[in-house]
Amino acid sequence: MNENLFSSFITPTLMGLPIIILIIMFPPVIMTSSKRLVNNRFHTFQQWLIKLITKQMMAIHSPKGRTWSLMLASLIIFIGSTNLLGLLPHTFTPTTQLSMNLGMAIPPWAGAVILGFRHKMKDSLAHFLPQGTPIPLIPMLVIIETISLFIQPMALAVRLTANITAGHLLMHLIGGATLVLTSISLPTAMITFIILIMLTILEFAVALIQAYVFTLLVSLYLHDNT
């Protein structure tokens, strides 16, 4: 029996309708604010995490750039929680979809670029032509810098998609090998099972690291334009 390795990355449907919107909305639902006078441990941890993220991300920013702190904190929490929820068995990981990751990368990148051209026109245009460039190389460098600017959101999305997809595929392959080896060689199956556990722990770290890297790069793009 042949199994499609990429079947877990296909957008799930309910009665023929895609339910990815419900999946995307799930992390914000579990991160709702508390209406209690005294917060429980979960909401206390949530507030501490937001303050820590804001402090780390906004240290290099000007007052104008710090107005993006809530958006960046929401972005890293959303990506991190979505990646972690995708590690649960029989679940769908939205961040394995390039279209969704592009949807998260393009708006903040475009907002940062527009903000730069609006408030720092000369500095933004100076990025296209480094100082001291020989005159014959000016047209080529302008084209290269323009292409590199528009590649930034694609690089963000592809990096996140590739890392999350690769980890899930490895877990799928090693898990399948473990099931097959249980009926062939139990000692070998135990070794592959230990490898699977170690890989799962590594994927937990990768899920959080990729959320941090994605948001950090958005923060750096914002810093370059404010």
Swiss-Prot record:
Transmembrane region(s): 10-30, 68-88, 97-117, 138-158, 164-184, 189-209
UniProt KW keywords: ATP synthesis, CF(0), Hydrogen ion transport, Ion transport, Membrane, Mitochondrion, Mitochondrion inner membrane, Transmembrane, Transmembrane helix, Transport
Gene3D superfamilies: ATP synthase, F0 complex, subunit A
Keyword Secreted: no
Major subcellular site: mitochondrion
GO molecular function, one term: proton-transporting ATP synthase activity, rotational mechanism
Superkingdom, natural source: Eukaryota
Pfam families registered for this protein in UniProt: ATP-synt_A
GO cellular component entries: mitochondrial inner membrane; proton-transporting ATP synthase complex
Location in or out of the cell: Mitochondrion inner membrane
GO terms classed as biological process: proton motive force-driven ATP synthesis; proton transmembrane transport
Iron-sulfur among keywords: no
Catalytic activity: H(+)(in) = H(+)(out)
Annotated membrane topology: Multi-pass membrane protein
Family: Belongs to the ATPase A chain family.
Function according to Swiss-Prot or TrEMBL: Subunit a, of the mitochondrial membrane ATP synthase complex (F(1)F(0) ATP synthase or Complex V) that produces ATP from ADP in the presence of a proton gradient across the membrane which is generated by electron transport complexes of the respiratory chain. ATP synthase complex consist of a soluble F(1) head domain - the catalytic core - and a membrane F(1) domain - the membrane proton channel. These two domains are linked by a central stalk rotating inside the F(1) region and a stationary peripheral stalk.
Assembly information from the UniProt record: Component of the ATP synthase complex composed at least of ATP5F1A/subunit alpha, ATP5F1B/subunit beta, ATP5MC1/subunit c (homooctomer), MT-ATP6/subunit a, MT-ATP8/subunit 8, ATP5ME/subunit e, ATP5MF/subunit f, ATP5MG/subunit g, ATP5MK/subunit k, ATP5MJ/subunit j, ATP5F1C/subunit gamma, ATP5F1D/subunit delta, ATP5F1E/subunit epsilon, ATP5PF/subunit F6, ATP5PB/subunit b, ATP5PD/subunit d, ATP5PO/subunit OSCP.
Protein name: ATP synthase F(0) complex subunit a
Gene name tied to this protein: MT-ATP6
